[in-house]
Amino acid sequence: MTQTRQQLGKARRWIIKIGSALLTNEGRGLDHEALAGWAEQIARLRASGREVVLVSSGAVAEGMSRLGWTTRPHALHELQAAAAVGQMGLVQAYESIFQRHGLRAAQVLLTHDDLSNRRRYLNARSTLRTLLALGVIPVVNENDTVATDEIRFGDNDTLAALVGNLTEAQVLVILTDQKGLFDRDPRAHADAQLVSEGLAMDPELLKLAAPTFGQLGRGGMATKLHAAARAARSGAYTLIASGREPRVLERIAEGEQIGTLLCPDKEPLAARKQWIAGQLIAKGELILDTGATKVLREAGRSLLPVGVTHVKGEFSRGDVVTCVDPDGRPVARGLVNYSADEARRIMKHRADEIEGILGYVDEPELIHRDNLVLL
């Protein structure tokens, strides 16, 4: 047992994400026996003093079963209908199963809109923290019924990581039908080796994760690695493991070397910067010259208009924008001090020239370093 695994086992607040394949009867609705098994393991974690937030897939699969559909639909309105029907069964199942262990569950449905708005983000954080303080197990899912393509998280791995940021959890456990991350595709290479530990933000790991998509789920190993990187921003460890392993949650809590453990390698971001980093949808893009790129990456300074060569998109003051280098690679994300039109007028100019161009000066920086997060 490594020291890191021991620390993992001592973590108090856990986010547990369980994929569709582990909750359904091969697409034929919910597997109530499987749900009962997960509830029993979670109840034991709670009895040991740990707090648990459950991010559960399965609503669409259950809805498909109730509606008699055998193939996952592609049309958004059909997915939303299936989610609405299936959510009823999912909530009823969790409420009943957790009651057997003397536990209360709460349904929490979120969209990216809820987390991109600062006030709603803080409200969601307060609600989740209150539920945990009351000993309740929040069961979180994306609000598929109202989410549009523009405001979707895209997968529950991403949602789980953002909920981890929201609640300042120490551990994110992503349970899947795979044993973890391998150095080669195990389906094609019999000698593929499991990656036991790594750094959550190591770009080399992404090269090992070819995107995969099943009929019921939306994400593959690549989405799980991106989720781990997001979770690391608040200092959380991510453990990707097979939900087919017996007593998997208890064994993780005991510090057993199971699955792939991805560790944070930087200090946690401040709460406000976690919120900025968690924005999945940027309103615009600022293309930087090589000098500005270097200053941001190496010194983490504020972004001045003189270092911007192009402005893409339409945005307002206070919106989230992405900063990219001359080759289009993301450098940072931040809250911009000027609208897109204003930014186009002052780009390539020094800060002391802003008033002469616009007739006023809101801020000398396009993005202040306190509102800037390096990617």
From Swiss-Prot:
GO terms for cellular component: cytosol. This is Glutamate 5-kinase. Gene3D superfamilies: Acetylglutamate kinase-like (3.40.1160.10), PUA domain (2.30.130.10). Catalyzes the transfer of a phosphate group to glutamate to form L-glutamate 5-phosphate. One of its GO terms (biological process) is L-proline biosynthetic process. Pathway: Amino-acid biosynthesis; L-proline biosynthesis; L-glutamate 5-semialdehyde from L-glutamate: step 1/2. The lineage of its organism: Bacteria, Pseudomonadati, Pseudomonadota, Gammaproteobacteria, Chromatiales. Keywords: Amino-acid biosynthesis, ATP-binding, Cytoplasm, Kinase, Nucleotide-binding, Proline biosynthesis, Transferase. It is an enzyme of class 2 (transferase). Substrate binds at S57, D144, N156. Its main location: cytoplasm. Its EC number is 2.7.2.11. It is found in: Cytoplasm. Belongs to the glutamate 5-kinase family. Coiled coil: none annotated. HAMAP family: ProB. GO terms for molecular function: ATP binding; glutamate 5-kinase activity; RNA binding. It catalyses: L-glutamate + ATP = L-glutamyl 5-phosphate + ADP. Residues 283-361 form the PUA domain. ATP binds at K17, T176, D177. It comes from Thioalkalivibrio sulfidiphilus (strain HL-EbGR7). The keyword Plastid does not apply.
